[in-house]
A protein has these predicted regions:
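The conserved Walker
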Residues: 177-178
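Hydrophobic positions on the alpha1 helix immediately C-terminal to the Walker A/P-loop
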Residues: 185
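A short, polar/charged loop-to-alpha-helix boundary motif
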Residues: 376-392
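Flexible, solvent-exposed loop/hinge segments and secondary-structure transition points
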Residues: 392-393, 414
């Protein structure tokens, strides 16, 4: 893989920037952490070289002076809201993230339940955490939020919230997902710190959009594609341009909210340290791109992937037409189309040649490998097997898992499970391959090579079953499907 981003430089430079911001506020900073602290696969795809856990690595550099506070909305607890990517509830994800941060040497400052009004499940959650020895604080709804600044920044507003006791210079405020109230927690703490005579500051950590890249740079356009379902946009920060004469890029919601946020800061401390939304940020990602061409190419590929994902969603659910339309426009902004990856045309050609579902994958060296539907293997299983054979140097015609192993599984699916689709899916093929490795060393080599396919792009001539797609994602393979279902079926998994 060609590298376009210096991860080590980023970790050092980002930690130094946060140190600098702490010192600007006299030694106490509340840092609102947006996006994913862990598993930031979007960033790693568009900035080749960026580690998915780079931000967590960076925080480890600050572990001796940092603590983490979690915000979670009481209504999300009450409604059992789940993370769409990993399927766990927000309530459980807070505990999962706590374990991860503690394992990395970071102190846990506690959990703030925002919008708390005595919701039964939120009360039970609070009791559960306190029984585990975790500090829990309640922040309450404020009438007229966020426009009624006189009430919000008063003893009857932020003053009613429970004060979060912190002991470190850096307080990282994070959450399991959007809408959890991170910003409100930070501002409430600024009010209550100020009331106690403690000088403290606020800053915002967001990876995207990258403020010091052009508005239409593919890295920033890829972020718009990733958030197309929200209907938001990257824009030039007008406040920064007016205050500093410098063109920077920011998120439209942050720009729209800035006047209110600035007024709140002025009400809390008498003056605002920031003249623009860009001023609030500490993001150093743009300074660590070492090969812009590589990052542009990777970002264009991601925009195309987002198009296929949105098109598949529209076909599966009938929802997301506006999202797809927006991504179409973004593709035009960076001059790409659906044929950006050579695997797209290759899979369509293979499907036309065989008359059945087919797939193609771009190998790490750029070679295109194909797979087709057969009696024993579905196209996703066939493609994965052929790709594994290629990366370890096994001839395509060499059998590393025999028909004698595969056929009984197909028979079981047909006779016992009464399934219409009897050919092996990707995970079943991998299990069969693993069993074959007992007697065939080549099969063992292929199983061990799955990590070599991480980051590869696979395309299929129609939408594949969700089980197959899930296995590809677990292996770190990017999947795109032509947004049509196989002909002749009304029900699709």
């Amino acid at each position: 893989m060609r590298i376009g981003f210096d991860n080590e430089k980023y970790i050092t430079m980002q930690a130094d920037r946060i140190h600098q911001r702490i010192s600007e506020f006299g030694g106490k900073l509340y840092l609102e952490f947006g996006g994913k602290l862990l598993d930031d696969n979007h960033a790693s795809r568009i900035l080749p070289g960026f580690a998915p856990d780079a931000k967590a690595q960076m925080l480890q550099q600050l572990a001796h002076e940092a603590e983490v506070v979690f915000a979670i909305n009481a209504n999300d607890i009450e409604n059992g809201k789940r993370r769409s990517d990993i399927g766990v509830t927000y309530a459980d994800d807070v505990l999962r993230l706590m374990d991860i941060f503690r394992a990395r040497g970071l102190a846990i400052g506690g959990v703030v339940i925002t919008q708390y009004s005595g919701q039964p499940k939120a009360k039970a959650y609070r009791a559960r955490l306190e029984n585990m020895g975790i500090a829990v604080y309640r922040h309450y709804p404020i009438e007229g939020y966020p426009s009624n600044i006189d009430l919000i920044v008063s003893a009857e507003g932020y003053g009613k919230n429970e004060y979060v006791k912190t002991t470190h210079p850096l307080v990282v405020v994070t959450a399991p997902g959007p809408g959890s109230g991170k910003l409100a927690v930070c501002l409430s703490q600024l009010y209550n710190e100020n009331a106690r005579g403690v000088r403290a500051g606020y800053a915002k950590f967001e990876t995207f959009p990258v403020w010091n890249l052009p508005l239409k740079h593919p890295v920033n356009v890829a972020y718009e594609a990733a958030t197309a379902d929200l209907g938001d946009n990257n824009i030039i920060d007008p406040y920064h341009l007016e205050a500093h004469g410098e063109v920077t890029v920011n998120y439209n919601r942050d720009v729209e909210a800035f006047p209110v946020l600035k007024a709140m800061m002025e009400k809390i401390a008498g003056t605002s340290p920031y003249q623009s939304p860009t001023d609030m940020g500490v993001n150093m990602v743009g300074n660590c791109i070492i090969d812009d061409a590589v990052c542009q190419e990777a970002s264009k590929a991601e925009i195309v992937r987002r198009w296929f994902r949105a098109a598949e969603k529209l076909e599966r659910t009938g929802m997301g037409e506006r999202e797809l339309t927006k991504i179409n426009l973004l593709m035009k902004d960076v001059n790409v189309d659906q044929n950006f990856s050579p695997a797209h045309a290759a899979c369509l050609h293979k499907a036309e040649e065989t008359g059945k579902l087919a797939g193609a994958m771009v190998m790490p060296d750029g070679t295109i490998i194909t797979g087709k539907t057969s009696e024993l293997l579905g196209a996703p299983a066939s493609l994965l097997l052929n790709a594994l054979k290629y990366v370890v140097g096994i001839e395509k015609k060499t059998f590393i898992v025999s028909d004698e192993v595969l056929r009984p599984i197909c028979t079981l699916k047909e006779n016992n499970f009464k399934l219409a689709r009897t050919s092996l899916c990707a995970d079943e093929m991998l299990i069969a391959l693993s069993i074959s490795s007992i007697t065939n060393p080549l099969a063992g080599k292929a199983v061990d090579a799955t990590q070599l396919l991480r980051g590869c792009d696979a395309y299929f001539s129609s939408i594949i079953p969700s089980d197959d797609e899930s296995i590809y994602h677990k292996l770190g393979i990017n999947v795109c499907c032509e947004p049509i279902f196989e002909q002749g079926h009304f029900f699709h998994q």
